[in-house]
Amino acid sequence: MDQLDLHLFWELLPLKGLGPIQFLSEKTDVQLYDKILGKIIAEEHENLEKRKQDLQDTVKQFSQFFSKEDLKIAIEALEETIGNERDDISTTFWGSGISLEYKADQLVEIFADDRAKLLHFQDIPIFSAEPIHLIGEISKQLNEIPLIKDEEVVFPKHHLFLFSFLSEQVDGQYCEGSKKNRSISWRNSPRTHAVNLADYQPLKLF
C-alpha cells in the first residue's frame, strides 16, 4: 500500500471502525489486512459452554472435594460473570498495537496502544499529539462533552474511551496523564457490563 492508503487505513472512525475495517466485519475479512496489522501475537476466547464443560471436568476429576451443589453454584456464578453478552467472544492481538474483539466472529471493539503510531483522528495523531488538543478536537467534531474519572476519558454517545491521556486531580482539575500506559478503544455499541458513569465528571476543556 502507498502512503495515502496507509493514512486512510489508520483513521479512527468513531462508531464505524478503523479505516476500511468496519464494525461487524467478519474475522476472515479483517485478516486480509494482516500485512498492515502485523503478526497475530496472541488470541483469547471466551465461550460459556466450554467453560462450563471445563468446570464439570474439574469437579469430576476432584469429586472427593466437590459436591453437585458446589458445581451448581460454580456454574451459576460463571453464567453471571460471562453471561450471554460475553459468550462467544474472541480477541486477536496484533503486532502493530491493535487488538480486535469479536462476538460470534463479528468485530465489536477496537483497542490500540502506543505502538499504533500511525493511528489518527482527522489527521491528529492519537499518541503523539498533545492530549488536551486531541480530546478537544474530538469533542468539537463529535459535538459531545467527554467525561473523566481518574485516568479515563469517555465519550459515552460515541462509545470512545481514552486511558492515561489526562489524569483527574482532587481539585476537579486535570493534568496530562502518563504516556507509558496510554491506550484508546472504541465500539459501535455500549460496552457489556458497562461501568456506571454516575461518578464521572464532565471534562471542561474550553
Task: State where each predicted segment sits.
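Short helix/turn-capping signatures at newly exposed starts of structured segments
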Residues: 1-206
